[in-house]
Amino acid sequence: ATELYRQHASNGAQLWMVPANLSSYRDVDALAQWIGNAEVVTSGGTSTLVKPALVPTLLFPFAAGRVAGSLADAGPETESQARLLLWSVERSIAALSAIGTDTNVDHRLHVILPGSPNRGTFGGDGAYGEVKSALDAIVNRWSSEKQWAQRVSLAHPRIGWVRGTGLMGGNDPLVAAVEAAGVRTWSTEEIAHELVELCTEQVRAQAAVKPVEADLTGGLGDNVDLVALRENAAKAAAGQTSEPVEASATIAALPSPATPVQSTAPNWGEFEADL
């Protein structure tokens, strides 16, 4: 973020970096309050405006940790994953879009919802598939829940395979096999360009009428058997490493060093003495 600010920020731009645990509803609410209220420091009878009250324009709720676990592992860990990936996203949209209701009547918060074609396709990724399915429901609720939707516009890209990210980095060894099956994978720079394109004035005008859907799957959801690809890649890797390896020369091990025997404390038994 700091490098992006240094290289591309325009004159007068400001960068604010605020620590927040987005799995905590309390932190989500506190962050919204911090954004929407001015920060003033008073010293010696003089008040200094440190941060003005801000009205959010764009929201990229892309915070995501590593996910793991099968359906059989459903429990507190998957609940924590869903809280970060879904419930905190909904709470953030509601809280941030409400800022400036009295002063910026026609303002809309433009939200880029990070969708995915993954509906359990990979397997073993915890609540991820269920959460991405739930983002489809948020898009549908935009048309039926005007109390928040009238101040929100949605762009819903369904993002496919992005190489080298925290979520997909572990699957990078399968990239060659996936691309051979006809699936396009994205670099982080390529997908960033596509996401920024969803923030233009034209797209935001369209999203004010109805949510904008964007297919960035690269064919990932088109009946691609990822389990079979993973198994075939594992077999190929095992075949490459199954060639006999020439044994290295060995020498007899040196004798073990002598270990001193520690003396045990004598057993004096019980005794009594007058003090």
Regions found by a protein language model. Give the residues of each.
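Hydrophobic, Leu/Ile/Phe/Ala-enriched alpha-helical segments that form helix-helix packing faces
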Residues: 2-9, 35-43, 92-100, 138-146, ...
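N-terminal Rossmann-like NAD(P) cofactor-binding module of classical short-chain dehydrogenase/reductase
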Residues: 58-62
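N-terminal targeting segments with Sec-dependent signals, encompassing both cleavable signal peptides
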Residues: 73, 83, 182, 265-269
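Catalytic loop of short-chain dehydrogenase/reductase
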Residues: 63-177
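Short-chain dehydrogenase/reductase
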Residues: 1-55, 65-72, 77-80, 252, ...
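ACP-dependent fatty acid/polyketide chain-elongation machinery
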Residues: 250-275
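C-terminal helical subdomain
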Residues: 156, 160-162, 171-259
